């Protein structure tokens, strides 16, 4: 739930005529799920003590933990290491950190670094953390739906999501597949109804 997500929903809605934007404004709890707050991250950078940029959200959205809270401080390598996601088995990969999306009431700051970059960090160095972000609980939550009515009310639901930034196969592809299915079903008569959500 961020400005990038809202932009994606608005683009989706413009492209698929007849789809509908849904805005939920009151924070809700359904079973154990709580409506996720709007996260506005203007900047996220990790620099060394010489002020040299190591990673930034501007270069790669996956570099910062999603829903990372605001922080601006200098830390030693031992502290930084606790807030780094990396994988030696995928040395070039910037891995998506999603924990905060499911525990947004207790977010942690951090960065995702390719292992090849992580192993070059100097253990004796200090590092500058600057994440400019805030949470807006009352901004609401945006969603979209695209309905193809059939003769019956019984509905098949096709679900996709935009909550994984910069990842086509785990977000965008599912959304587009669902909406394309509805778009094509609208050209024929169907017994059942179909909803992309």
Regions found by a protein language model. Name each.
Residues 1-197:
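N-terminal hydrophobic/helix-forming segments and targeting peptides
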């Amino acid at each position: 739930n961020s400005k990038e997500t809202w932009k994606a929903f608005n683009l989706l809605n413009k492209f698929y005529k007849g789809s509908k934007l849904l805005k939920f404004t009151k924070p809700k709890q359904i079973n154990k799920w709580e409506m996720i707050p709007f996260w506005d991250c203007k900047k996220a950078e990790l620099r060394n003590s010489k002020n040299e940029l190591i990673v930034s959200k501007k270069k790669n959205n996956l570099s910062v933990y999603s829903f990372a809270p605001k922080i601006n401080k200098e830390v030693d390598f031992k502290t930084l290491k606790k807030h780094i996601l990396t994988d030696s088995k995928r040395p070039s990969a910037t891995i998506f950190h999603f924990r905060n999306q499911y525990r947004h009431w207790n977010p942690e700051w951090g960065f995702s670094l390719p292992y090849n970059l992580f192993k070059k960090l100097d253990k004796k160095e200090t590092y500058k953390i600057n994440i400019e972000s805030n949470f807006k609980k009352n901004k609401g939550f945006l969603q979209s739906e695209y309905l193809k009515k059939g003769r019956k009310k019984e509905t098949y639901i096709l679900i996709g999501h935009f909550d994984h930034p910069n990842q086509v196969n785990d977000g965008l592809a599912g959304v587009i597949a669902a909406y394309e299915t509805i778009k094509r079903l609208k050209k024929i008569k169907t017994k059942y109804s179909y909803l992309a959500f």
